[in-house]
Amino acid sequence: MKDILILGIETSCDETSASVVKNGRQVLSNVISSQVALHQKYGGVVPEIASRKHVELIMPVIHQSLEEAGIKIEQVDAIGVTYGPGLVGALLVGLSAAKALAFALDKPLIGVHHIEGHIAANYIEHSLLEPPFVCLVASGGHSHIVYVQDYDKFEIMGKTRDDAAGEAFDKVARAVGLGYPGGPIIDKTAKLGNSKAIDFPRVHFGDQSLDFSFSGLKTAVLNYINSMEQKGEKYSVEDVCASFQAAVVDVLTDNLISAARIKGVKKVALAGGVAANSLLRSELVEKAKGLGLEVFYPKPVLCTDNAAMIACAAYYEFLRGHTSDVYLNAIPGLKLGER
């Protein structure tokens, strides 16, 4: 059987990335140019700046990915690209490059949903992983529990009703003066604190709902900080981070395990930037032990936005004959399962 090479392109937020993946699982290259340092002074991603940087970097990043893979552009079988959700200006840069290449080379174009890409990162890390399983996709923009019935069949079982988990990490990090991005900094700082020092709320909705809500938790953290400052008392940043992180992780892991029970599956997975959190990984493994659940998660570099996951997802779309035409447009609010 002939090897299938997919060129993946990802520009949905502040990473410019291109990757070549063979047969959906073997990464030949995965070039990622991050803009984190560029946006740090603003405390978050500035869409216009992100788009302009993508324009500057997209072709050099694509060329580098082909060079590292040791192939010529003509050798790729198809081009996969994120077309939503994300920042519309950022999405358009990657999409324009992918469409131009596909048209010029007469190669199939495959539009990939960003969240499907994050889920697919697990296939790269775990060569034997196959659906069905339930997956928690948690990042700065998303908090979803997804039932992965097949490589191209997804059901959202739960989602955030307000702030995404990663967004809450960013806001709390800013509140305690740790800067942006909040996830890695809080993870590191929390290791020095006591997770039981402050009893922050855990929101669980009734009626078997697996939805999340982190705005109340975020407000509780801000109220605690303001209260301590008004009383002229010092508070431990380490304890705040540890207690906040523990509250988030408790809810995420509880809901994911509940989803596995509801669907009767024995495999649970993590995906997205928050999936790199060390407590989330260890806590899920610990809770899954006595339940006969297998736990899967990608290496940290595959948790953040990257094109390898997009190429992987595109591969399974390609096998099913799902391709896009040159009229494919960026859809910033694209819902999972829409085509």
Swiss-Prot record:
Q: Which residues bind Fe cation?
A: H114, H118, D305
Q: What is its EC number?
A: 2.3.1.234
Q: Which GO terms describe its molecular function?
A: iron ion binding; N(6)-L-threonylcarbamoyladenine synthase activity
Q: Which Pfam families match?
A: TsaD
Q: Name one GO cellular component term.
A: cytoplasm
Biological process terms from the Gene Ontology for this record are: tRNA threonylcarbamoyladenosine modification
Source species: Acetivibrio thermocellus (strain ATCC 27405 / DSM 1237 / JCM 9322 / NBRC 103400 / NCIMB 10682 / NRRL B-4536 / VPI 7372)
Predominant subcellular localization, coarse grouping:
cytoplasm
Q: Which UniProt keywords apply?
A: Acyltransferase, Cytoplasm, Iron, Metal-binding, Transferase, tRNA processing
Protein name as it appears in the record: tRNA N6-adenosine threonylcarbamoyltransferase
Report the sequence similarity comment from the record.
Belongs to the KAE1 / TsaD family.
Give residues annotated as binding substrate: V137, A138, S139, G140, G141, D170, G183, D187, N277
* Function comment: Required for the formation of a threonylcarbamoyl group on adenosine at position 37 (t(6)A37) in tRNAs that read codons beginning with adenine. Is involved in the transfer of the threonylcarbamoyl moiety of threonylcarbamoyl-AMP (TC-AMP) to the N6 group of A37, together with TsaE and TsaB. TsaD likely plays a direct catalytic role in this reaction.
Asked whether the keyword RNA-binding is assigned, the reply is: no
Q: Which NCBIfam families does the UniProt entry name for this protein?
A: gcp_kae1, T6A_TsaD_YgjD
Output the InterPro entries linked to this UniProt entry: ATPase_NBD, Gcp-like_dom, KAE1/TsaD, Peptidase_M22_CS, TsaD
Q: Which PANTHER family match?
A: TRNA N6-ADENOSINE THREONYLCARBAMOYLTRANSFERASE (PTHR11735), TRNA N6-ADENOSINE THREONYLCARBAMOYLTRANSFERASE, MITOCHONDRIAL (PTHR11735:SF6)
Q: How is the cofactor bound?
A: Binds 1 Fe(2+) ion per subunit.
Q: Which reaction(s) does the protein catalyse, per the Swiss-Prot or TrEMBL entry?
A: L-threonylcarbamoyladenylate + adenosine(37) in tRNA = N(6)-L-threonylcarbamoyladenosine(37) in tRNA + AMP + H(+)
Task: Give the subcellular location.
Answer: Cytoplasm
The protein's required cofactor(s) are namely: Fe(2+)
Q: Does the keyword Thylakoid apply?
A: no
